[in-house]
A protein has these predicted regions:
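Short basic (Lys/Arg) and small-residue
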Residues: 145
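Catalytic P-loop NTPase motifs of RecA-like helicase/translocase cores
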Residues: 101-103, 130
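A short acidic, amphipathic alpha-helical/loop segment
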Residues: 37, 105-113, 137
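Short recognition patches in nucleic-acid-associated and regulatory proteins
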Residues: 153-185
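Walker B catalytic acidic pair
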Residues: 97-99, 125-126
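Sensor-1/coupling segment of RecA-like P-loop NTPase cores
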Residues: 114-137
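Residue-level preference for the first positions of well-ordered beta-strands
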Residues: 19-21, 47-49, 92-95, 120-122
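Conserved P-loop
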Residues: 2-85, 129-140, 153, 177-209
Length: 209
């Protein structure tokens, strides 16, 4: 086979995909934007998948704090995202909510979907955990994404300064040790999360006095 015929036999791609990462603290509208983006793409006749992991609803759904929601595929650690997409006849884009909780291998798979299959991938998530340390998946997204956007919806600390860090609160006190991923803010759960400015995150002040 000549070089020219080999190129002719290669699968044609009409366009390149893009991998975008949208990040910000809690309450900045990440899930709301993910749902809006899915709605906009579907209106244009595009076919997509919506993925999530550890959504506050406890089920395979993307839900926002303002009451919006959509069914989604629940991402578990051993789910191969390339294999998932290839099971479908047509996928133009993938919405990945709570992408900070994915495995690093799954972030690599998202890049594969973009580079090898021309699929647009839109990932949404936190950058850092309750210890103010970056999630491994978020770090890999910062390294691989074509475009990175910090969401501009203003989230405030109790003092009025911009909220930047996600504090874990147990029994009314800020904690800095424990498992990286613990779901809170659900019903009467003893664990909740609060967005703080850097000053009050470091001092541990929750503004309750």
């Amino acid at each position: 086979m000549t070089e020219l015929s080999a190129l002719s036999a290669a699968p044609a791609r009409t366009r390149d995909g893009v991998l975008r990462f949208y990040f910000g603290p809690m309450d900045c509208g990440k899930s709301t934007l993910a749902l809006q983006m899915n709605y906009n793409h579907r209106r244009q006749g595009r076919h997509g998948l919506v993925l999530t992991k550890h959504d506050r609803s406890g089920g395979p759904r993307v839900t926002s704090r303002i009451g919006l929601g959509s069914d989604a595929v629940e991402v578990v650690d051993d789910l191969d995202l390339v294999a998932l997409v290839r099971k479908h006849e047509r996928v133009d884009y993938v919405i990945c909510d709570e992408a900070c909780f994915y495995t690093v291998a799954q972030i690599e798979q998202l890049a594969d979907l973009t580079d090898d299959f021309g699929i647009d991938v839109y990932a949404f998530g936190l950058a850092s955990d309750f210890r103010s340390q970056m999630f491994p998946a978020a770090q890999r997204l910062f390294e691989l994404a074509d475009e990175i956007s910090r969401l501009q919806v203003e989230v405030l600390c109790w003092c009025g300064r911009p909220g930047r860090l996600n504090a874990r609160v147990v029994g009314g006190a800020l904690v800095r040790t424990g498992e990286q991923v613990v779901i809170g803010d659900i019903g009467d759960a003893p664990i909740r999360y609060q967005v703080l400015c850097r000053r009050h995150y470091r001092s541990g002040s929750l503004g309750q006095d």
